């Protein structure tokens, strides 16, 4: 529970001590032992049982605690050298700062400062959705057999995407984007 509660309790002999533990948990792993599963340019040499054994090293409950789970494919030479019009770091920084301000304003009367700190019971009040967004979320919940924790984290990511777009209501577009960043099937597919 330290990841959800933001505190660690250490119990010794006659006393218990609580310490703050608000962290950002980040992890990375190869898709298989050889690293080439799903690669378009290299052939994976792993057997299905090797891949399954490898991916089962991370438990479902641990994976559930990652808000964003994405596969990052190899970048081709053409993609690497292509000239693209993209947001500058300064533009992205401005959007992030504006989103943080929205969250601070939203939670000014609460004991929280960000969407990541929302509890399940707060989602209805602070994460209003369009009917289309709710329908997409319900469909995804059943199709992906999501846990309650996965559901909560998906909604919070969608709320943050809305904040980055400067919107108060979660749309189907934001749910869809959050679903793309919550690839619960990474380990299941292997």
Show where each model-derived region lies.
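Basic, amphipathic alpha-helical bundle interface domains used for macromolecular binding and assembly
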Residues: 2-189
């Amino acid at each position: 529970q330290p990841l959800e509660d933001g505190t660690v309790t250490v119990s010794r002999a006659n006393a218990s001590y609580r310490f703050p533990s608000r962290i950002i948990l980040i992890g990375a792993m190869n898709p298989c032992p050889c690293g080439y599963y799903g690669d378009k340019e290299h052939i994976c040499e792993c057997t299905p049982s090797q891949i399954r054994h490898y991916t089962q090293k991370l438990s479902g409950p641990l994976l559930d605690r990652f808000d964003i789970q994405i596969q990052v494919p190899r970048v081709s030479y053409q993609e690497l050298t292509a000239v693209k019009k993209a947001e500058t770091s300064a533009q992205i920084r401005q959007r992030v700062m504006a989103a943080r301000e929205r969250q601070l304003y939203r939670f000014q009367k609460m004991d929280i400062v960000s969407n990541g700190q929302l509890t399940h019971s707060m989602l209805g009040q602070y994460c209003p959705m369009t009917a289309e967004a709710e329908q997409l979320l319900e469909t995804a919940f059943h199709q992906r057999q999501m846990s309650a924790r996965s559901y909560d984290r998906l909604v919070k990511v969608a709320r943050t995407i809305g904040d980055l777009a400067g919107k108060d209501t979660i749309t189907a577009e934001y749910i869809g984007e959050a679903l793309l960043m919550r690839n619960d099937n990474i380990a299941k597919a292997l």
